[in-house]
Amino acid sequence: MPEAKTRSKRGSTRTNMLMSAAQVMRERGASGVTIDEVLARSGAPRGSVYYHFPEGRNQILAEALRWAGDAITESIDTAAERGALPLVRNFSEFWERTLMESDFGAGCPVVAAAIGCTNDEAQLTAIASDIFCRWRDALARAFVADNFDTAAAESLAVTCIASLEGAVVLCRSIRTTEPLRQVAREMEFLIKSREFVRRNGLPTGGH
């Protein structure tokens, strides 16, 4: 079994490096991710960089972003099976935990990659776009399952993601999770209001 143990160790080293890179990206953005910092946080030997990531830093950035995006997407897909409202609550609670556990030091790596990459890191914008689209599609499917039409489902999905991600940025800035809670409450009110209108139509005036 020594060979299996070696493969497991190599896989663990690679994963630890990706986790470390994703964490730095949450805190400092893509431009803050350096090989030295990834090695320091992961405890990996320097020789492991080009063994696991022959294309160097850009490969680490791209794969770390995909790794982080996949982890969040998996959580979203699971919550989406319970409906749109539980998904919005789950998304809000996930970011609230992340902010509190990091003492407001860590935000969303996907947002960081989307708005903070340099020309040399342009590939990250495309990866971030793909991740956001997957989140939007998962949330839209949840709204469709709750009997919203496709156009309304997509509009609500984009509104929820944009509002919650914006709230995360605001929370980090003022070091409180209250904006996230406020946005989550407003999103819940909006969803319930749209559901009421869907079922009963808009008021036509009069008393």
Regions from the PLM with identified roles:
Residues M1-S12, E195-H207:
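N-terminal intrinsically disordered/low-complexity leader segments
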Residues N16, S20, V24-E63:
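Helix-turn-helix
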Residues L65-A71:
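Short, basic, alpha-helical segments at the C-terminal edge of helix-turn-helix-like DNA-binding modules
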Residues S75-A106, L156-C160:
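Hydrophobic alpha-helical connector segments
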Residues L87-N90, E101-A126:
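Amphipathic alpha-helical segments used for helix-helix packing
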Residues T98-E101, R141, I161-P179, I191-R199:
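Amphipathic C-terminal alpha-helical segment
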Residues P109-A112, A151-L170, Q182, E186-F189:
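Hydrophobic alpha-helical segments that form the core
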Residues D120-A122, F132-A157, R194-N200:
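Hydrophobic alpha-helical bundle segments that form small-molecule/ligand-binding pockets
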